[in-house]
């Protein structure tokens, strides 16, 4: 993800002499204290989100419908209350973002259609190889597949499937709300957009370590394999979190990251090993390479802020005195 780094990694200066003390950058707090408040607020949100999954005592596995329903209740409550954490952070730091709280968190109408479509299209391009693999391995042809996808009965079955609702709706919506929409506005004034893109996913990645508890409880594998799997999942979710954080900043919308998260949950991690042993290996690997190449080529054009209107986080940094944030142009 080289496109996310570079000059975006510089720290936001908080001691420019031309800025008045009451600047919107850090309010009434010094830079060090403001950053500690921001990091502590993000850590509190992450702990609250993961902790809410374990308030219900149960001996049942995580995929049991009863467990899923209880956890729906928990994470929906935590996610609904998470904007209050941002509101409290704003009061403690004295930062004035220049927009409403909901707008700052990506809930706005300006540019909503390109924000919903273009990031999803970009992500599907990245998954060109896995999509080709899925198509090759599917026993039905394209016309039959579309009939199944568009059939109301198929959607009715999905909406009554607790695991589908968790993976495609509740998890993407609540995780993006908490780990992107709430955390990025708190981290950006402290460290700048570039470092925030890479710091925010660390909370997201660590939050997925709770799966170790489930696997150890039910002895789903050896201890070594469980921790190896957890380390891999942390790496994968951290990279994915950086990508959706990048999308959130560049579009100023929450809907794009949510849809991309849902799509990636459906696709899973690309089955590269299976592709290497596939009967149609050469065209499939060419599809993988083409997808990655087109993704890198289109990453900047399809996330150009000019397509999405005024970006709330960029407005916040402009008020903080940083009018040249690289990710804002």
Curated annotation (Swiss-Prot):
<protein>
    <recommendedName>
        <fullName>CAAX prenyl protease 2</fullName>
        <ecNumber>3.4.26.1</ecNumber>
    </recommendedName>
</protein>
<dbReference type="Pfam" id="PF02517">
    <property type="entry name" value="Rce1-like"/>
</dbReference>
<dbReference type="GO" id="GO:0071586">
    <property type="term" value="P:CAAX-box protein processing"/>
</dbReference>
<dbReference type="GO" id="GO:0005789">
    <property type="term" value="C:endoplasmic reticulum membrane"/>
</dbReference>
<feature type="transmembrane region" description="Helical">
    <location>
        <begin position="186"/>
        <end position="206"/>
    </location>
</feature>
<dbReference type="GO" id="GO:0005886">
    <property type="term" value="C:plasma membrane"/>
</dbReference>
<feature type="transmembrane region" description="Helical">
    <location>
        <begin position="283"/>
        <end position="303"/>
    </location>
</feature>
<keyword id="KW-0007">Acetylation</keyword>
<keyword id="KW-0256">Endoplasmic reticulum</keyword>
<dbReference type="GO" id="GO:0005829">
    <property type="term" value="C:cytosol"/>
</dbReference>
<feature type="transmembrane region" description="Helical">
    <location>
        <begin position="229"/>
        <end position="249"/>
    </location>
</feature>
<dbReference type="GO" id="GO:0004175">
    <property type="term" value="F:endopeptidase activity"/>
</dbReference>
<keyword id="KW-0378">Hydrolase</keyword>
<keyword id="KW-0645">Protease</keyword>
<keyword id="KW-0832">Ubl conjugation</keyword>
<dbReference type="GO" id="GO:0000165">
    <property type="term" value="P:MAPK cascade"/>
</dbReference>
<feature type="active site" description="Proton donor/acceptor">
    <location>
        <position position="175"/>
    </location>
</feature>
<feature type="active site" description="Proton donor/acceptor">
    <location>
        <position position="208"/>
    </location>
</feature>
<feature type="transmembrane region" description="Helical">
    <location>
        <begin position="112"/>
        <end position="132"/>
    </location>
</feature>
<dbReference type="InterPro" id="IPR003675">
    <property type="entry name" value="Rce1/LyrA-like_dom"/>
</dbReference>
<dbReference type="InterPro" id="IPR039731">
    <property type="entry name" value="Rce1"/>
</dbReference>
<dbReference type="GO" id="GO:0008238">
    <property type="term" value="F:exopeptidase activity"/>
</dbReference>
<feature type="site" description="Transition state stabilizer">
    <location>
        <position position="265"/>
    </location>
</feature>
<dbReference type="GO" id="GO:0018342">
    <property type="term" value="P:protein prenylation"/>
</dbReference>
<keyword id="KW-0472">Membrane</keyword>
<feature type="transmembrane region" description="Helical">
    <location>
        <begin position="75"/>
        <end position="95"/>
    </location>
</feature>
<dbReference type="GO" id="GO:0004222">
    <property type="term" value="F:metalloendopeptidase activity"/>
</dbReference>
<comment type="similarity">
    <text>Belongs to the peptidase U48 family.</text>
</comment>
<keyword id="KW-0812">Transmembrane</keyword>
<feature type="transmembrane region" description="Helical">
    <location>
        <begin position="25"/>
        <end position="45"/>
    </location>
</feature>
<dbReference type="GO" id="GO:0004197">
    <property type="term" value="F:cysteine-type endopeptidase activity"/>
</dbReference>
<comment type="function">
    <text>Protease involved in the processing of a variety of prenylated proteins containing the C-terminal CAAX motif, where C is a cysteine modified with an isoprenoid lipid, A is an aliphatic amino acid and X is any C-terminal amino acid. Proteolytically removes the C-terminal three residues of farnesylated and geranylated proteins, leaving the prenylated cysteine as the new C-terminus. Is able to process K-Ras, N-Ras, H-Ras, RAP1B and G-gamma-1.</text>
</comment>
<feature type="site" description="Transition state stabilizer">
    <location>
        <position position="261"/>
    </location>
</feature>
<dbReference type="GO" id="GO:0016020">
    <property type="term" value="C:membrane"/>
</dbReference>
<keyword id="KW-1133">Transmembrane helix</keyword>
<feature type="modified residue" description="N-acetylalanine">
    <location>
        <position position="2"/>
    </location>
</feature>
<feature type="transmembrane region" description="Helical">
    <location>
        <begin position="254"/>
        <end position="274"/>
    </location>
</feature>
């Amino acid at each position: 993800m080289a496109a996310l780094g570079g000059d975006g990694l510089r720290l936001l200066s908080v001691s420019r002499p031309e800025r008045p003390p009451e600047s919107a950058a850090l309010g009434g707090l010094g830079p060090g204290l403001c950053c500690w408040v921001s990091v502590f607020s993000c850590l509190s949100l992450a702990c609250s989100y993961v902790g809410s999954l374990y308030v219900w005592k149960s001996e049942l596995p995580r995929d049991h419908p009863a467990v899923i329903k209880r956890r729906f209740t928990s994470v929906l409550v935590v996610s609904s209350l998470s904007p209050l954490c941002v509101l409290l952070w704003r009061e403690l730091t004295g930062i004035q973002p220049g927009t409403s709280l909901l707008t700052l968190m990506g809930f706005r109408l300006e540019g909503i259609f390109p924000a919903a479509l273009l990031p999803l299209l970009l992500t599907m391009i990245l998954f060109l190889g896995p999509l080709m693999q899925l198509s090759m391995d599917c026993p039905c042809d394209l016309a039959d597949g579309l009939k199944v996808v568009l059939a109301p009965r198929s959607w009715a079955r999905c909406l009554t499937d607790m695991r589908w609702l968790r993976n495609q709706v509740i998890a993407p919506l609540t995780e993006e709300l908490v780990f992107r929409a709430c955390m990025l506005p708190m981290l950006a004034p402290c460290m700048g957009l570039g470092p925030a893109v890479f710091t925010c996913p660390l909370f997201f990645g660590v939050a997925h370590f709770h799966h170790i508890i489930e696997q150890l409880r039910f002895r789903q594998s050896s201890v070594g394999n469980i921790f190896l799997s957890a380390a891999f999942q942390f790496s994968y979710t951290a990279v994915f979190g950086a990508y959706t954080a990048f999308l959130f900043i560049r579009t100023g919308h929450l809907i794009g990251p949510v849809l991309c998260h849902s799509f990636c949950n459906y696709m899973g991690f690309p089955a590269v090993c299976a592709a290497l042993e596939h009967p149609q290996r050469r065209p499939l690997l060419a599809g993988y390479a083409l997808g990655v190449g087109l993704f890198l080529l289109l990453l900047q054009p399809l996330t150009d802020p000019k397509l999405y209107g005024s970006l709330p986080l960029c407005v916040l940094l402009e008020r903080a005195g940083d009018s040249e944030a690289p990710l804002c142009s």
